[in-house]
């Protein structure tokens, strides 16, 4: 397996290794470009009546409003209305104002509608990777603390050509512009629904985004009475080789019956799972031989084992199977165990 470490002005197109924490120090004026994803006929994710293009704009406007409460920062938007823009134009807008960072805001959806949580996509190479990974960690930390969102981590994805898989990151890289994609949560998963079901919650994501940006750049705000000029941000060393995604599933997933409780009619089953590259993120299990599976649950960090307790129907043959998923949603199935 390959090793991975799992920002209102509308502009015209005419006019891109964990170390010791370092102290954020604001330059004389920071320039941030916030990109509300999608727009126009490009709706984005809309699985349950929510439309991503509208949600990203609400979040972006709130992010801009909050960031402008800080001194020493100029904040721009790629769009402030429902218009369609190409990914290349969005990156070029950021470059035209000499942005220090481009933040592409999104809400997520998975192909099988089973995953949940927030994730950050960073560029895969050099100083842009280091900046994106550091900023991504601060963003996720805010989401965990303020929004109570599960973190899916900071990730990279490289296409078959060896360039960035995601267009906005690819065009930003060509312009030597640091950028991240911020996927705030999943719109197609009930587990995340409570985090995006009101306008104020969408705005809160924007405020969290702004706080993470302020911490990254070491900004201060008189009105908010905060000063992040000495905030310790993650120190990420630029990689000598491009980072790549984890394309392999977890190495191990096994089951073992550890207890049969005939009084309460339950069986305890231990799940053992490992993924040395990106770690185990979710697990699920079936008690009908794989015909149906329970909703995904969060795998406890820093452990290779957990125990589930399932109902037992004595006199009937039952078969349990576990499914475990790593940071890149790679899945491994255990062999069945009868009980």
Residues covered by each model-derived region:
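Bacterial N-terminal signal peptides that target proteins for export
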Residues: 1-9
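Bacterial N-terminal signal peptides
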Residues: 8-19
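Sec-dependent signal peptide cleavage junction
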Residues: 20-28
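Active-site-proximal helix/loop segments of hydrolytic enzymes
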Residues: 28-31, 54-251
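Catalytic-core environment of secreted peptidases
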Residues: 29-48, 103
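Long, low-complexity serine/threonine/glycine- and acidic-rich segments characteristic of extracellular
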Residues: 248, 256-339
């Amino acid at each position: 397996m390959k090793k991975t470490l799992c920002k209102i002005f509308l502009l015209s197109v005419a006019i891109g290794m964990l170390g010791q924490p370092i102290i954020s120090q604001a330059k004389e004026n920071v320039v941030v470009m916030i990109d509300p994803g999608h727009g126009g006929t490009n709706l984005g994710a809309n699985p349950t009546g929510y439309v991503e293009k509208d949600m990203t704009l609400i979040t972006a406007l709130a992010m801009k409003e909050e960031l402008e409460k800080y001194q020493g920062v100029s904040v721009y938007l790629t769009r402030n209305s429902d218009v369609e823009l190409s990914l290349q134009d969005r990156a070029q807008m950021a470059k035209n104002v000499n942005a220090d960072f481009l933040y592409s805001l999104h809400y997520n959806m998975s192909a099988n509608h089973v995953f949940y949580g927030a994730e950050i996509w960073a560029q895969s190479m050099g100083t842009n990777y280091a900046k994106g990974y550091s900023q991504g960690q601060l963003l996720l930390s805010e989401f965990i603390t303020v929004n109570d969102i599960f973190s899916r981590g900071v990730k990279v994805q490289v296409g078959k050509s060896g360039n960035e898989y995601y267009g906005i990151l690819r065009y930003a890289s060509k312009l030597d512009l640091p950028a991240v994609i911020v996927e705030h949560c999943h719109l197609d998963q009930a587990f995340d629904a409570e985090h995006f079901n009101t306008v104020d919650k969408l705005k809160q994501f924007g405020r969290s985004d702004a706080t993470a940006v302020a911490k990254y750049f070491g900004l201060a705000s008189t009105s908010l009475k905060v000063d992040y000029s000495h905030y310790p941000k993650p120190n990420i060393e630029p990689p000598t080789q491009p980072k790549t995604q984890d394309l392999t599933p977890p190495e191990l997933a096994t089951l073992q019956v550890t207890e049969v409780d005939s009084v309460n009619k339950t069986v305890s089953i231990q799940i053992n799972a490992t993924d040395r590259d990106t770690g185990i993120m979710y697990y699920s299990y079936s008690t009908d031989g794989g015909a149906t599976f329970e909703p995904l649950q969060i795998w406890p960090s820093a452990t290779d084992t957990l125990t589930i307790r399932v109902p037992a129907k004595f006199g009937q043959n039952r078969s349990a199977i576990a499914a475990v998923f790593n940071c890149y949603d790679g899945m491994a199935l255990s062999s069945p165990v009868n009980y």
